[in-house]
Amino acid sequence: GLQSNAGIKPFDFYIKKGEVNGFTGLLGSGRSECVRAIFGADRVIAGKLKKNGKEIRIHKPLDAMKQGIAYLPEDRKVDGIIGDLSVRDNIILAAQVLNGFFKPFSKAQAYKFADEYIKLLEIKTASADTPIKSLSGGNQQKVILGRWLLTHPEYLILDEPTRGIDVGTKIEIQKLVLKLASEGMSVTFISSETDEMLRTCSRLIVMRDRKVVGELNGDELTQVMIMNTIAGGDEKDGEK
């Protein structure tokens, strides 16, 4: 199993093309630490990562990005937005990192990319030059989402993407996730709201005390089953 330096127990994990799965569990159960290990944001100390059957090495986020993995972090204020930069510069940031800072996008390219995602995600902003800090929380979150979609990932990890945003934007993000999956993208979705997870995910990995204690899919995807697995999850350990 995969293990990082963030104190999570070794865990096995897979995701299929076009699938939306999720990590669920109480706050502090280790959900974020699992995806941070996959993205290289925390150091992996044991286990292997494979893509299409071949082992890949991810020591840092840039390695993950080069493998087509994108990660929208839990705290957009700390790890996501760069407040003083414009909406445009925030959108192109990850793609520019992948492209290399010695090969900057032209002004025309930058505007084209920004306008494309402002339109696609219906980001409410006066212009692409507006500082991102002046946007609402929901629109800031859409900008970060646009930033990662611009890298054209094969696998998108969303950690609490709808926390602290209005209901309308929440529904838009959920619909977008399902649309991306239908187009072949693999998505891991983490939310503290179990009803949101049940609406969005076709498979749930249940965690307790920094350990995977069960996996639910199909008819098992109910609030009751999630809570039962969190409460008495050890008995599902042997089913892996």
Task: List PLM regions with ranges.
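Glycine-rich phosphate-binding loops of nucleotide-dependent enzymes
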Residues: G1-K240
